[in-house]
Amino acid sequence: SGKGGRGLMAQAVELNGKKILVTFLMHLGDLTLTTPFIHALRKAAPDAHITFLADEKLKDVVLHNPYLDEVITIDKKGKDNSLLALMACARRLSKMDFDVLINLHPNERCSFIDAFTKVKLRCGTTHTMFKPLWDVFTPLNRKIHAADMYLDVLTQLGVKKLEHNGLEIFPSEEY
């Protein structure tokens, strides 16, 4: 199809020096598989401010990641498990004035929040119903390993060199 919402797929996006919001509200194993993406994003955009939206119950997977500047959480199965709560989350995120939003998974909850968050550039993947709102849509290649699939989003956004150390876990100082 070639078209994805308001923009084209595989469009180079300026990431360095930008306020970037990465959204991912999936399960523990899936979240761990985003760590190469986070590292590669930081290497590609060393001067960016990178914020990550994750599920409250899984925040420890990303909380101490040195490649992130900030982690924001929602309690997706608890207090934030309603459309009103998701809209409130989108309003909170909108006030943070992000330049670029990158969604890594097309689940409905994350796609809904992303669709209603005011940002300058919305990219990555999304649920089909929200695709017309995306500036740069990056389809997920489900024929490759999930960690590589998330890295491929950066390739589609024009990142030429994907530097990372594979899967990484950064425990708190207590460990």
PLM features: what roles do these ranges have?
Residues S1-Y175:
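Catalytic machinery of carbohydrate-active enzymes
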